[in-house]
């Protein structure tokens, strides 16, 4: 490197800096065991890679500026891991990688996320599913390394605003099972009214016995309107509640009134004829 400091003759410096000098001084550059990048623009000639603070298992990137062309080299300090970059990476990219991840994790993830040429043809894509990339970037979160398939075209929205959708049942299937529905549920249809009655809280109607009806008719013949004392006495003798006795007397008066009206109409019709 004495030619850069100005201690060597001018003719020697011209040979060292000129572009064809790479062939004559290839022995001095081969000792560094680096990769030469000849296709670099002249705008990046002044850039140099900063040496990242890495352990013995990582590689160190640096560059030489010989006039206008730029030569980038990477030195590997480990014999087990050999990472060779086949394309030019600027200095900002090296700074991002070294700042985001430690050096040990960077060397291990470089093996884990290696993309092989036959990776795209190793599995067949299923139509109707969305493929999520299995291999994320180096700075991605480690928990996102999962292959997920989301169905896209099999989803249907069920509108349940007023009930079930009308297109849920097929008419062809119903024609085959109409006789089964009639035979199995024919006994249940007459009891629908009773089931509705139970739902409204009404009790099943229990007819009165002959002894109870005889006692009620006897009291009704004595008086069409019942008092509180008589109601208690009839309830005790007939084993009925006071409310049942009161309702029976009301129904009996309505029945008698209808009978009287009907008989009066029939009598008037007879006289008119």
From Swiss-Prot:
This is Homeobox protein Hox-C13b. GO terms for molecular function: DNA-binding transcription factor activity, RNA polymerase II-specific; RNA polymerase II cis-regulatory region sequence-specific DNA binding. CDD domains: homeodomain. Keywords: Developmental protein, DNA-binding, Homeobox, Nucleus, Transcription, Transcription regulation. Pfam families: Homeodomain, HoxA13_N. Disruption phenotype: Morpholino knockdown of the protein results in a biphasic developmental delay characterized by a reduced body size with 22-23 somites by 24 hpf; the first delay occurs before gastrulation and the second during late tail bud development. It is found in: Nucleus. Transmembrane segments: none annotated. One of its GO terms (cellular component) is nucleus. Signal peptide: none annotated. Its main location: nucleus. One of its GO terms (biological process) is fin regeneration.
């Amino acid at each position: 490197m004495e030619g850069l400091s100005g201690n060597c003759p001018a003719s020697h410096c011209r040979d060292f800096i000129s572009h064809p000098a790479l062939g004559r001084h290839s022995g001095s550059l081969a000792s560094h065991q680096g990769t030469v990048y000849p296709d670099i623009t002249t705008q990046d000639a002044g850039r140099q890679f900063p040496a990242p603070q890495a352990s013995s298992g990582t590689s160190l990137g640096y560059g030489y500026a010989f006039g206008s062309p730029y030569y980038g080299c990477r030195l590997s300090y480990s014999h087990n891991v050999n990472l060779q970059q086949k394309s030019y990476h600027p200095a900002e990219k090296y700074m991002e990688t070294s700042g985001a991840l430690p050096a040990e994790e960077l060397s291990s993830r470089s093996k884990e996320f290696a993309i092989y040429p036959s990776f795209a043809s190793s599995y067949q894509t299923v139509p109707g599913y969305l493929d999520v990339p299995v291999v994320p970037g180096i700075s991605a979160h480690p928990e996102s390394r999962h292959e997920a398939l989301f169905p896209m075209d099999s989803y249907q929205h069920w509108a349940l605003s007023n009930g079930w959708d009308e297109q849920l049942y097929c008419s062809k299937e119903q024609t085959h099972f109409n006789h089964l529905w009639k035979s199995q549920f024919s006994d249940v249809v007459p009891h629908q009214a009773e089931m509705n009655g139970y739902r409204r809280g009404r009790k099943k109607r229990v007819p009165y016995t002959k002894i109870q009806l005889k006692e009620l008719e006897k009291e009704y013949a004595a008086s069409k309107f019942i008092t509180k004392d008589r109601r208690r006495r009839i309830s005790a003798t007939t084993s009925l509640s006071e409310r049942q006795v009161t309702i029976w007397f009301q129904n009996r008066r309505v029945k008698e009134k209808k009978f009287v009206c009907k008989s009066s109409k029939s009598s008037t019709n007879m006289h008119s004829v």
